[in-house]
Amino acid sequence: MQAIRQWRRPLYLMFKPRPRERAALVRLCAALGIEIVYAPERWHSTLLPIGESTRQAIAAIHEALRVFDAEPFSVAFDHIEGDTLKPRKGQRAPGCFQRALTARIARCGVPLPDYAFSLHLNLAYGGTSVRRAAVPPIEWPVDEILLIESGSGRHVEHGRWPLTVRQAAFAF
């Protein structure tokens, strides 16, 4: 693994809240007095930083994920620290998924930076806040991951992979 550094056009694997949850997050920001200066469409949770965005890196990620088979998982956030939404305690699925994703990418020879995954979602960047509060739970199923180039105040999508349920659920 390589050290994380400042990239001009960083590339990330991430997931984003769905529109309904994004609307709930906008309401939460209003209730908490968080100024929305970062477009809600760009709110995300980073699963894995890749490095500088290049055609080669994008192609390598596409090849690695061509055969990546993973199921959807749920995330739930129930408290805020500063301007960062934090997860409900006890969630194992996001970390398990992230480790499997990292292993798959690394097995395909993609050099990855050192990265300690910690589930969170930043609602604002650049400010400082001592806010600490429980919030009404915001939960959704993560059913796709995105390859995003970030920079200059925008997200450019370079890939999208659905997560597919492999085992049928039965109502009893």
Cite the ranges covered by each PLM segment.
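Histidine-dependent nucleotide/RNA phosphoesterase domain, centered on the 2H-phosphoesterase fold
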Residues: M1-F172
